[in-house]
């Protein structure tokens, strides 16, 4: 089975997370900005879309799944 993801922008990611669920400095240092394209898998791993690949830039902890699907309007997809 392939890994599933939900794609979102950096701005939407900020709307999804609660304080303490993510290391914002780590994301900033990796180059994540408001219009960055990101994807998150069900394990909470966050990847940043680069020119020719996806780069792992951090991870979420906590109960983010329901907020993620509600705020993006998306379901998990391969």
Label the predicted regions.
Residues 18-69:
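Acidic, low-complexity, intrinsically disordered interaction modules
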Residues 2-13, 53-78:
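Mixed-charge, Lys/Arg-enriched low-complexity segments
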């Amino acid at each position: 089975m392939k890994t599933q993801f939900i794609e979102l922008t950096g701005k939407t990611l900020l709307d999804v997370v609660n304080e303490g669920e993510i290391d914002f400095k780590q994301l900033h240092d990796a180059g994540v900005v408001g219009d960055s394209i990101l994807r998150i898998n069900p394990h909470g791993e966050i990847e940043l879309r680069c020119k020719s690949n996806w780069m792992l830039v951090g991870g979420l902890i906590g109960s983010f799944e329901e907020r993620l699907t509600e705020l993006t309007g998306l379901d998990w997809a391969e």
